Structures are given as structure tokens and as C-alpha cells.
Amino acid sequence: MMHPSNSASHITDDNGQTSADSRSQETVVREKGQAGGIFLHAGWRSAGTWVWSRFRALQTVTAFYEPLHPILADLRAADIPALEPTWTSGHPKLTAPYFTEYRPFIRDDLHGVVGYRKSFSADRFGPVADAGFSTLQAYLKSLHDQTRKQGKIPVFKFCRSLGRLPWLKDAFPEVMHAVVLRNPASQFASGWLLHQQWSNPFFVAAPFRILGLNQNEPIVKEVIEVCGVRLPPAPVTSIDEYAAACEQFVRTVDGDNAYRAFLAVWMLSALRSADEADLLVDVDRLGQSPEYASALRARVRGQVAITPDFSAARDLVAQMKGNASLMKEIDGRSIKSIHASALGFMVSKRGVSGPGTDGAELIKEKLVLARELSEQWRYY
């Protein structure tokens, strides 16, 4: 387990060079009005892992991968070396296994990361923090504070946090809350192809699980109705049992319903992002525009004093267009109308109705792009 140490007395740049300074890095950051870290909120298959890897490459950063992942409940230090990307994941080659940064927080005599609870893995979309949030806050604060004491900048890459983004922003106002945004057609297709080609149901089941566990929230119920989602005919008992029921359900789910469920979760997440994000990372544009990649780098440097390199981003839109013929068991013509319904709903809600706001315009662009890309999909 990590032991507290004295604050760093040297300032280290992104290249690992240090210079003596009587003040701690924490003090310098406060005086410059910069954020004390980054919470990188992303959905599954959004290219969030690639964005996170750009921060992990910096020597001044400690980059935590998915701090709400259920694997952390039972993780042992001996398990970490085997947790490398598979070639089917589409993740970038990593310089170290996924969960390496948690090693100091695992006690030798116990399984699991100190402070983690498996209940953290279920995202929530309630208007106010639930009863268990204070425990989650304490867990993340421990990771954050211990990292700062080591003289590093913490970057957390989440895949289960977008519903709780308002709660996390209230609890951690000192960090920059960045949201990775990808058009829903490409994001869905990435998970659908893994389901079709490799019998991996997780990414298709996840939206049904999130919607089912949150279906009593008024905003969730409304989005389910707008999208016409048919949830699994299973009672919501425990989180694990409902997750298993969802994975069984999607083994025979029709593509139309799977996309509707995914789009519903995307819409809910986008609403949170438009209202709460300090920075929106447009990964569709990132691979198309070197100017945008450079501007994003400068924006991060200005707020957090680190300079990630985004120049190697792939053109994910072109990639999706090239893979359109691989999409089977879903017809783009049958889901064409849902994008119009989604856009109308999003425009009607607070945070997306203001004229010309960056978040609102970007969300609209993503829905228009999704309609264009999905029109090429055919059932057979």
C-alpha cells in the first residue's frame, strides 16, 4: 500500500527533467490557477483509452485506468502483468499493463484496491448523489491526494462515470472534467462488431444494463420512451444478476433495439456533458484535423500544465465508412428516424437549447454524422 511522503521539492517537466524549487508542485499549480488533475470521462468504444494513453506517456502524470472497474475489487498485484490489450480490443499498444498504477494501493495480504467497492461500477443518473457516493468520493480522493503527494498529476480515465458527472464535478472542483465524445453510430458499431465477430456481448449488453438499473429516474424513463427501447424482460434484483440477464438477452437481440438502447445511453451522457464538462474532446475531429489536435493540446496545457501529444490520432470517421459493409443484422434505413427524434429531444432539454453553445452544437453535429454513417448499414 502506498505510504504518504513529503510533497515534491522539485518540479518535473513532461520529459522527466527536474529543477530545484523550494515550493511544492502543488503550490505552483494553485498559484497559477491550474487544475490539480484530470477526470477523463468516456463511454465504452469511444477511443477514450487512446486519449488516456497520451496522458500516460507523460512522465509528470500518473494515469489511472478505469478507477470504477469491477476488477479492482479482487485485483492482486500478481494479476497485473497479464492485463494487457488483446488484438481484438482495438486499444493502443501500452507501455505497461492496464492497471499498473494501482499496484501501490493493493495490500500484500488482501485482494482488491484499498477503498474500492464493487457497487462503484454501476453508473447512476439521479439528480442528486446517492447514499453511497461519499464512499466513492473518499476512494477517489485517496488516489488523487496520494498521487499529488508524489509530485505527479493524476489523470483518471472513467468508463462508468458520465451519469455521475455532476456529482463528481461538485465533489472534485479542483480537477478538469474532460469528456470524450464520439458520434454514436461509430461508437455503437465498434461494440456491435466485437459482438458479431468475436461473440463478445459486453458492449451491447451494457446500455441495457444501465437503462434497466436507472429506469425509475424520470429522465431515463423519458429517453427510453423517445428511443423506443425494449428492455430485457427480467426483474432488477442484484446488479450482477441483472447484468447476467442483459448479456443473455443480447445474444439474440435485434440490431434495431440494440442501437436504440445504445443511443439512449449516449443521449443521457451527452446531456450531462453539455451541462457539466470543462472540456469536450471530439475524437471524430481529432483524427481529421491537425489544427484541432494542436489546439486541444494547448487547451490542456493551459489548464493543467501538461502537454499530451494527440498528433497520431486515427481518422475514425474514415475507418467507420470503410467498415460499413461489415455491419450486419442491422439496417440503417430502419433506424433513420430515431436520429431525428433524438435530436428533437436533445434540443428541448436544458444545456442543449441555448443558441450556439459549444456543447449543444457538437452534440447536434454528432447526431447528424451518426445518421449519415448508419445509412450505409444493411441487414445482410
Task: Specify the residue positions occupied by each region the protein language model found.
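A conserved segment at the C-terminal end of the G1
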Residues: 48-61
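A short acidic, amphipathic alpha-helical/loop segment
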Residues: 50, 164-171, 272
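Conserved phosphate-donor/acceptor-positioning beta-strand/loop module used by diverse small-molecule
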Residues: 157-158, 171-192
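Short His-Asn-centered micro-motif
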Residues: 41-43, 155-159, 180-182, 282-285
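PAPS-dependent sulfotransferases, especially Golgi type II membrane carbohydrate sulfotransferases
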Residues: 2-37, 227-380
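Walker A (P-loop) phosphate-binding motif
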Residues: 33-46, 55
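Extended, charge-rich helix/loop segments that form flexible
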Residues: 111, 115-123, 204-256
